[in-house]
Amino acid sequence: MFACRTLCLVVVMVASLGTSGVGGRSVEGVSRMEKLLSSSISPSSTPLGFLSQDHSVNKRQVFDQACKGVYDRNLFKKLNRVCEDCYNLYRKPFIVTTCRENCYSNRVFRQCLDDLLLSDVIDEYVSNVQMVGK
């Protein structure tokens, strides 16, 4: 009796989560990100484009040396975290490199903010990008 009640409770909870809009990735989000990345002109928009660049991408490197703004390690970590979370959401390796391009001042970074449901703090991230940017 107790096992049946627990099973029924789990089924009801899963069903309610499925109908409430709470969930992981959406097909709409994936297609929107793929469309955004495919419209990019840069060579790193291809899945293996980051391998053809002249410099290697160091996983531990927190900041982009091309960014001429304020150097704040915590600020770079915060911006980089958005790109890493976006990669974890879509599992496409080129998202991380494309998201970091131009000192995070690009459409992919903005799309990642939207897809990670950070639109309520987007102004804070925009000002952070301007601080580290060129």
Swiss-Prot record:
User: Signal as a keyword?
Assistant: yes
Main location, first listed in the record: secreted
Record's GO cellular component, any one? extracellular region
What Pfam families has UniProt attached to this entry?
Answer: Crust_neurohorm
Q: Which GO terms describe its molecular function?
A: neuropeptide hormone activity
Origin: domain of life = Eukaryota
Protein name per the record = Crustacean hyperglycemic hormones isoform B
